[in-house]
């Protein structure tokens, strides 16, 4: 039988392929008994095992998802495993992304309020369980058949095609546009307070139909975020303006808390808090010996007291399975876009690699900031000594964006050095190069 139609452990019939990432495929499924529709994420264990620590992340993921069962969070129903695959059986959400609704235009304030009420209720519940999401955005918020909002895992939220619209950023695994300034600055941060900032950006987008901080140039967008530099459209009500102004506060210690959000007149209007699900059955299941593959011992553990770190990102494992993190649309069209790449290495590791590589190229290397380095050639070129800078930004946990640009010297010499020496030498730390296009021209910093 073809994989798309096979029966899984005698419990689920697997149907059409919904989408796929680097490590996983997601299928439409249906319970054999009961007929409930589900989404089944199939993870290739061999590929996961090649990444140190990732199997532990799966087990932690299971424990944490058991903590956050809530009407406004996509439910993880159970996890099963064989010797070669891991299966996440998830609630199937039929209504698609909230992003798709926003892409058609801004929402009426009452509709935006309803979605925001549900978002805050779910986030508050997560925080009460010691879990922070850290990548809240409309692409990760799904709507069920009743129009109710559900916070999604990243793998599922990346499946529906995204219709490009001016004013909204479109990336598969997250965007700095929704990230709190303290996270972008690579300082220690409170995950719960960072979530509140992201909720503020989401509310603004719901009401405006565009981002509060938007610029084709990534650095300019960062500057706006660091200053909370945004404007309200004229149709925003005074109450909505007051709330957003308290959500988008740069200092996390002065940012409004969720209990205070719950007390605001704007949110309390027609608000009925949902009741959280009762956790009364184990999520982990063992595979049957009669199935297509044997069960591997230890792939699914029952824990009476799941242990998770404070404000652990409950969804980051599935996020890591997505296939790309393309930020090319954020950069100036004239800049040579292959001067930007993303890395799964830490910012510190990336900086050390850049310094080592460029020193081996006989360049003078000097750090100007913790995560910015200037490199200068030791010989005169056509237009003096070639000089370039590299800056590393951690835009999400375990994801760094690196930007190279020429600060002095001849453009052709820079292009040749970058293409023939820098890029090949950095390949082992690169997750993806962005927007390779050999016909574009470089632009100085």
UniProtKB/Swiss-Prot annotation:
Q: Which residues carry this modification: Phosphoserine?
A: 157
Statement: the UniProt record of this protein carries the keyword Kinase: yes
Top-rank taxon, per record: Eukaryota
Please name the Pfam families in this protein's record.
Answer: NAF, Pkinase
In residue numbers, the region (PPI) covers: 336-366
**Region annotated Activation loop, chain positions:** 153-182
Q: Which residues form the active site?
A: 135 (proton acceptor)
Q: Which cofactor does it need?
A: Mn(2+)
Q: What GO terms describe the biological role, i.e. biological process, of this protein?
A: response to calcium ion; signal transduction
Q: SUPFAM superfamilies, per this entry?
A: Protein kinase-like (PK-like) (SSF56112)
Q: Does the keyword ATP-binding apply?
A: yes
Q: What residues bind ATP, as annotated?
A: 18-26, 41
> For the NAF domain, which residue ranges apply?
307-332
Q: Which residues carry this modification: Phosphothreonine?
A: 171
Q: Might you give the EC number(s) for this enzyme?
A: 2.7.11.1
> What is the purpose of this protein?
CIPK serine-threonine protein kinases interact with CBL proteins. Binding of a CBL protein to the regulatory NAF domain of CIPK protein lead to the activation of the kinase in a calcium-dependent manner.
Q: What is this protein called?
A: CBL-interacting serine/threonine-protein kinase 5
Look up and give the organism this protein is from: Arabidopsis thaliana
Q: In the record, what lineage is assigned to the organism producing the protein?
A: Eukaryota, Viridiplantae, Streptophyta, Embryophyta, Tracheophyta
